A protein has these predicted regions:
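Bulky hydrophobic segments
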Residues: 1-101, 107-131
Length: 131
């Protein structure tokens, strides 16, 4: 049986999507919930940002391999939609509240990842062109 050439990147993309779903829908342990209540900065927004920042890298590569015309734009839109759906699920199936800002933090994480990848690609091309 021959494994498709880009199977690993697609599998990694799926693994990140599943891991994010478990992380965001799983109830927060009461000890952790109580420990973070006094923190002024909303740590949950940082978690959403970081999860989608990391996941956007293989997602973008996977979409590029599939031939999506603008994989960066598609990743940001998909992250916003996926984050929104997860927030709805969180509000329906857990004791946690769905928050628009959590979805926005995830989309922003994906946007920053795409921006970093774009900057690295441009910088890499400039370096190659200079040689």
């Amino acid at each position: 049986m021959r494994v498709p050439r880009h199977f690993a990147v697609h599998l990694l993309s799926l693994a990140f999507a599943v891991a994010i779903a478990f992380a965001l829908i799983e109830p927060v342990p009461p000890d952790l919930e109580n420990a973070t209540q006094d923190i002024v900065f909303p740590i949950d927004k940082l978690v959403h940002f970081a999860l989608f920042l990391v996941a956007a890298v293989p997602w973008r590569r996977s979409l590029a391999v599939l031939g999506v015309r603008s994989p960066g734009v598609a990743v940001v839109v998909a992250a916003a939609v996926y984050g929104g759906l997860l927030e709805i699920a969180q509000g329906l199936w857990t004791l946690r509240d769905a928050e628009f800002l959590d979805m926005a933090a995830g989309a922003l994480g994906a946007l920053v990842a795409v921006g970093i990848l774009k900057a690295l690609a441009v910088r890499g091309r400039g370096h190659i062109a200079a040689e």
